């Protein structure tokens, strides 16, 4: 895919936002734009999750991916979605099952998110990235003490719904 001159909208969490990068110019979105000749629009917010939480606060990190789709520039040529690690790490939404269609389970939120993206960006390429490996990826109790599935199950859900 030739990206030169195209606009790529990146929807994600702290990794997309650039937390940990040595400077703004070294966020992966900016490096991608430099290497491809594209224009990067960064919609990353640290701590955010794909699924909605049971109790939503005014904090930025409670603005799940589904809440933010309408804020994305609809003229983008390509959309990249990179999330799921915070759903595993500290979310309170259960993973659910493939047939779910609610933002309150991970599977359901994926279905809702991909449907919203397809409606907002018809005929555009949508690329879905799975979470990076973590040291604690096999735990079944997350950082907030809430039962969860191992990270591999979140990766499988992302792949399954994206297909």
Regions found by a protein language model. Name each.
Residues 1-2, 9, 125, 163:
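Short intrinsically disordered, low-complexity coil segments enriched in acidic
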Residues 2, 7, 15-108:
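Conserved SGNH/GDSL esterase-like catalytic core that processes O-acyl groups on lipids
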Residues 63-163:
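Alpha-helical cap/lid subdomain in secreted, periplasmic
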């Amino acid at each position: 895919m030739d990206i030169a001159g195209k606009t790529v909208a990146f929807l994600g969490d702290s990794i997309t936002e650039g937390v940990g990068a040595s400077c703004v110019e070294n966020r992966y979105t900016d490096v991608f734009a430099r290497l491809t000749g594209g224009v990067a629009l960064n919609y990353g917010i640290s701590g955010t999750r794909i699924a909605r939480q049971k109790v939503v606060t005014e904090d930025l990190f409670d603005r799940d991916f589904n809440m933010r789709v309408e804020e994305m520039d609809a003229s983008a040529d390509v959309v990249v979605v990179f999330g799921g690690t915070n759903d595993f790490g500290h979310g309170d939404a259960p993973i659910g099952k493939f047939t779910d269609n609610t933002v309150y389970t991970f599977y359901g939120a994926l279905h809702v998110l991909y449907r919203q993206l397809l409606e907002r960006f018809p005929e555009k390429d949508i690329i879905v990235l799975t979470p990076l490996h973590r040291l604690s990826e096999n735990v079944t109790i997350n950082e907030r003490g809430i039962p969860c599935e191992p990270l591999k199950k979140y990766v499988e859900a992302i792949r399954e719904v994206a297909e």
